[in-house]
Amino acid sequence: MVFAVTVLFNGCSYNFIVPIEVPVIDPDDPDAPQISFANDIIPIFVDNGNCSSCHNGSQVPDLRAENAYAAINTSRYINSATPGESRIYKYCSPETTTHMRKKYNSAQAALVLVWIQQGAKNN
């Protein structure tokens, strides 16, 4: 009995992941922080194999760090007139039903959308 209780209380441990807080950024605010493609968007694509595990050159778009901007900087993926309709945002958004594999979390989706709203610069 003592053994069972010991295993029960010591058998499991949890590492809680604190969600990243992303501030709401108004793209029309001239003082709003600029989203950086290199520092903010590329990590979404490559960290932990998020997107680049599949989109690694064998599947379009190629989202490896060195190729990502050239691969998505087309009207097929970025809709500058209606950023929320951009394929690079909408196809992997948390609410999508079209992309069954990995999706953006809400913080990542917000960063991608604001980056597009700010002009989708290669910065």
Regions found by a protein language model. Give the residues of each.
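Sec-dependent bacterial lipoprotein signal peptides
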Residues: 1-13
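Aromatic- and Gly/Pro-enriched helix-to-coil junctions and flexible linker segments
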Residues: 12-123
